[in-house]
């Protein structure tokens, strides 16, 4: 495992796409692994707010730099994949770095995507770069499937179910409760609701009818379990609108049984065709993920290839998954794709 190769590398002479990673948490580590699986790409640098000497990466040919040195790399990186959080990092970081690099991010605050798009678009055009935002699986792959399904079945209803999987935001909310030492929260689709949609019943579903929440909580010594459970179940914006189950377990059990970050979900559209709307159809796209951040990272890396291709064509400005032709995601040529996948 590499530890102390710090900055100063010259641009590689190989023809691979040069990738930079900004932020080395779960998502950044996932990007590093994904780059390894793509033969046309090369990780050249990881940028961190921490002391670079304290950051251990896996790629022996890449270097670790402080974010303060990022401008020195403007001509050495083809695409910068920004792996910060949506709450406070990405709204600031992506516009700043879009002036210097082609950039990819996973901004997932749905209500603020139009605002974020406008900010990144202005910055990317100013710098002459391509920025692709809100890349991942929701937003991202789920968004694409909603668009395809709406275009194909204009008379219909959309349904999205998440899980079963770990919600990192809700897990953080549990851990903020007084008396909680540690915890994980799983979002679980209600099977009866999912079955009704698949049967073409077009149900009108409330928040509570679509998902349940299951919490596994480690208490601080001497904490009041009943009080903690009540505070979790009544927490607005997180648990109060759901049927929530709280399990109290030991730290050992949590570490043993709940250390992974699985997730997934379903996007469905139920629609009808025919002059009298006599025929019903269901479109369904589903994901079952052992590692939410590693899958998201794999999507980010595919869209990094698209950003590189668009930049080579002279394009600039902000894009989303809606704007990228599928062929731009692939390392294969058009001829190869038509022969092997079409």
Where are these regions (language model features)?
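C-terminal substrate-binding/catalytic lobe of Rossmann-fold NAD(P)-dependent oxidoreductases
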Residues: 18, 30, 37-70, 166-304
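Hydrophobic/small residue at the entry helix of a nucleotide-binding pocket
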Residues: 27
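N-terminal Rossmann-like NAD(P) cofactor-binding module of classical short-chain dehydrogenase/reductase
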Residues: 79-82, 104
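NAD(P)-dependent Rossmann-like dehydrogenase/reductase catalytic/cofactor-binding core
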Residues: 281-342
